[in-house]
């Protein structure tokens, strides 16, 4: 695995599996609380129900921002996370990570990082109105990138324009 500083992690997967820059380690500030999905969607920090209002507003505004979704289906032998970086130009940079943990606690298993993907951000549906849009943004036409973004490139893309 390649860390954000460009150093090669010696725990990288063997067998020629390509290493990817870990966007989760880039320190991007999330625009909304991380969302956890099990039987329903909840705010990961509080465990309480989440209406997705923050994510819906981010979608409607069309600006830059970051969302993280944690997929935790039962009985607990697989975990998946998705980091979506909205670039403010109708595009989003996405990375998924997963880990299977059949014989050990999931926290002890390293993440398998997916390739960076560039997606189009779909137009919000007419049912989404300001202060009344409780949906996760929809991404379309996602395609893996030939080369990963660095954490520096992410920081530049996520910076507010002067």
Region spans (language model):
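Signals and flexible motifs at protein termini associated with secretion
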Residues: 1-162
């Amino acid at each position: 695995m390649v860390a954000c500083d460009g150093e090669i992690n010696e725990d990288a997967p063997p067998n020629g599996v390509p290493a990817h820059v870990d966007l989760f380690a880039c320190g991007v500030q999330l625009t909304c609380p991380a969302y956890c999905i099990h039987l329903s969607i909840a705010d990961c920090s509080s465990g309480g129900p989440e209406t997705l209002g923050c994510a819906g507003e981010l979608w409607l505004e069309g600006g830059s921002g970051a969302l993280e979704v944690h997929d935790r289906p039962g009985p607990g032998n697989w975990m998946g996370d998705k980091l979506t970086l909205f670039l403010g130009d109708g595009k989003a940079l996405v990375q998924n990570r997963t880990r299977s943990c059949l014989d050990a606690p999931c926290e002890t298993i390293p993440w398998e990082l997916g390739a960076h993907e560039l997606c189009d951000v779909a137009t919000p549906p007419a049912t989404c109105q300001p202060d009344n849009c409780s949906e996760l943004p929809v991404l379309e036409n996602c395609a893996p990138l030939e080369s990963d973004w660095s954490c520096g490139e992410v920081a530049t893309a996520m910076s507010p324009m002067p």
